[in-house]
Every structure is written in C-alpha cells, then in structure tokens.
Regions:
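Membrane-proximal helix-turn-helix segments that form the acceptor-binding/catalytic region
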Residues: 75-76, 108-131
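N-terminal pre-catalytic "stem/leader" segment of glycosyltransferase-like enzymes
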Residues: 1-61, 65
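Donor nucleotide-sugar binding/catalytic pocket of nucleotide-sugar-dependent glycosyltransferases
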Residues: 127-172
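Nucleotide-sugar-dependent
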Residues: 190-194, 238-239, 243-244, 249, ...
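Conserved catalytic-core segment of nucleotide-activated headgroup transferases in glycan assembly
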Residues: 8-32, 157-226, 231-246
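A charged, aromatic-enriched C-terminal amphipathic alpha-helix characteristic of glycosyltransferases
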Residues: 168-170, 313-348
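Acceptor-binding helix/loop patch of EC 2.4 sugar-transfer enzymes
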Residues: 12, 16-17, 86-118, 162-168, ...
C-alpha cells in the first residue's frame, strides 16, 4: 500500500478542510486515492516542520513556504528516494507580476509585504522539480520562470462524490427549492469588489427587479442596489454555502482581465451547475474549457447584458439534468486522479 502525505501551507491550522484551496488540492484527492487503496493523510506545513513525518512514499506540498527547516526536510526527502511534488492552484510565486495580485490591489498588504511574500514563494518553488497545478496557464508560468528543468502535470479541480452527495441530499431529501428569478454571487474574499463593479451596469439593466443574492464580503455597487432587490449574507460555512447556491437559478462569476485571474480554476461553473444553476462567467481558460447549454460566457459589458438576459430567461426551459450531467461529465475527479497517478508513476521511474 502506497502512503501519500498532503502538506498544505494554510493559515487555517485547526480545520484546514474548510479552506477551499486545501479542500480541492489535498482532501479531495486524498479521499479518492483512499478509495483506490492508498493510505492518505492531510496535514499543515506547521505540523510537518514540527514533527518527524518521514514514513510516507509520496509527499505533495500545497503552496510550499520558504522556511529553512521546511526546505531542509524537503531536501532530505528528495535525497532519500521519496516522491516529492509541489502543488499550486494560484499564481503566488510570480514576483514579476506580484503588484498585479489581488492581495496588493485590494489593499490587504503593502507593496513591501507583497513583494516579500511572493519572493519567498518563488524561492521555495526553486527547490522542486515536479509540480501539479490546477490550470494550464499556471503550468505554463512555472515552465517560463523555472531556473532548472521541471516537469508539470495539470490536475484540474473537479467534482467529488462528497460534493455531489451534498447536492443530491438537498435536491431529493431536503427539497431545497429554487427562489424564482434569484441570481447569486458568491465571494470568498474581499478582493472581488472590482470584478463586480465591472459588470454592475449590465446586472442593473438585465436583472432589474430581480433578487440578487450576495454571499460573502463584497461592496455592492449603488446602481445594482437601486435596480435590483439586494440580499446580502456574510460568509457562511461550507454546507450552508452549497445550500444557498442551490436556491439560485443563476450564479454569476465575473473577473477582470489579469494574469492572476487567467490562472484561476473554473470551479464556480461546476459547483453551481451541479447544484442546478445556470452560470454566467468570464471565460478565463479554466471556464472556457467547459461547454453547456446552461453556461453563458461573457467578456464585454454588452456580452454580459446579453448573457444575463439569456441565462435568466432560459432557466426554466433548460432541463436540470442537462446542468447536472454536463458538470458531472466534464469535471470528473476520477479522470483527474488518473492523470495524477500516471504522473506519480513517471516520477517513480525517474527517482528509483
């Protein structure tokens, strides 16, 4: 039995599962691998540094930090024939573009702090040869900036059996009902104010009189507040968030054009679609790879106006099964795990 340890550099030390990034990049893969006979555990970089954890075969470091003790342990693993992989789901290592990051642009960190964070992340990256990433643009950027020869495998975020079972439970057992005409926007962090502002006029025009549900930290533009029935709810727990998604007919996911956003995952589509929602989204590469009658892609303001109108007006005419099956077939975690296993086998042949 192969033993796999996922190590995440998350600030959520007590309950890392509720960090969405850790859930997708560590727990979801671990659950699927456990089903296939692997022995998998998830821990934090804090625990990895503090304890002797050297009895695993494969180590996956999610967003690895630059810390002398941490790096020494990683080097020991590499020198002792362990399979060592760095995993990224965000462009946290690109010093050249650090000041274009939402961390800096949202004012959550000073220029000095942002450059320090990105410099340390970049320094950590240079100690790894093998990488898994959530999107193709992320992989391309690692190839571009790496100083040594590297190998990168794209393992997309995908739907898990656990997420599907939550949605199915809401659909069949709890009978959570759609709120007619409700359009939802789900913001995990305060960094999305500008994204929403870019499409505010389109929302106000195409969704006038409809309920707009905003969940999480976001400043709702005045033009939307005047035109729509706005409901705002603070950030909620994971299961409650899924329930709120399931009450929406349409979920929107606007993003401004930037190198950082182009590297983001398209999970907003498949999470919402499997919950029975149509989706209007900016076609970042990881959204653009999906096709569905219930996915409406928009970039310009006029495209957003049209897409919002089409999504809201066509909701009842598109079978719920189309939304669910499209998401299930195109965001299949079993296919992603197969890619991961092939990559690990390739590494194993090289390090043995």
């Amino acid at each position: 039995m192969k033993k796999v340890l996922f190590v995440s550099h998350t600030a959520r030390l007590n309950r890392p599962y509720f960090d969405p990034s850790v859930r997708y990049r560590c727990f979801n893969l671990a659950d699927e691998l456990n089903e296939r006979g692997y022995y998998c555990k998830v821990t934090t970089s804090f625990e990895f540094i503090k304890n002797d954890i050297s009895n695993f075969d494969i180590y996956v470091f999610h967003r690895p930090p630059f810390d002398p003790e941490f790096i020494d342990k990683v080097k020991w693993l590499q020198n002792n024939g362990k399979i060592v992989i760095a995993d990224y789901d965000d462009l946290v290592f690109d010093i050249e573009n650090a000041l274009s990051s939402s961390l800096y642009k949202s004012g959550r960190a000073s220029q000095r702090d942002v450059l320090n964070i990105f410099s340390r992340n970049s320094a950590a990256l240079n100690y790894f040869k093998y990488f898994t990433v959530s999107t193709h643009p992320l992989g391309a950027r690692i190839y571009e900036i790496s100083k040594e020869e590297v190998d990168v495998c794209v393992v997309h975020n995908a739907l898990t059996e656990k997420y599907k079972s939550i949605c199915d439970q809401l659909r069949f057992n709890e009978a959570v009902e759609k709120v007619k005409g409700r359009v939802g926007y789900f913001s995990g962090t305060k960094s999305h104010d500008k994204d929403l502002a870019l499409v505010a006029d389109a929302i106000a025009e195409s969704c006038a009189g409809k309920e707009l549900l905003f969940v999480g930290p976001i400043d709702v533009p005045e033009v939307i507040q005047k035109a729509c029935k706005v409901t705002q709810i603070p950030l909620v727990g994971y299961h409650e968030m899924v329930k709120l998604i399931a009450t929406c007919e349409v979920v929107i996911a606007p993003l401004e054009s930037s190198i950082f956003n182009s590297c983001k995952s398209g999970l907003k589509y498949f999470e919402s679609a499997y919950a029975g929602c149509s989706v209007v989204a900016t076609p970042i590469p990881d959204i653009d790879r999906f096709t569905s009658q219930s996915l409406f892609k928009a970039t310009s303001l006029d495209e957003w106006k049209l897409a919002l109108k089409q999504a809201t007006e066509s909701f009842e005419s598109i079978p719920e099964s189309e939304r669910i099956n499209s998401a299930k077939e195109q965001a299949n975690i079993k296919l992603e795990v197969e890619k991961w296993l092939e990559f690990v086998n390739k590494i194993s042949a090289e390090v043995s």
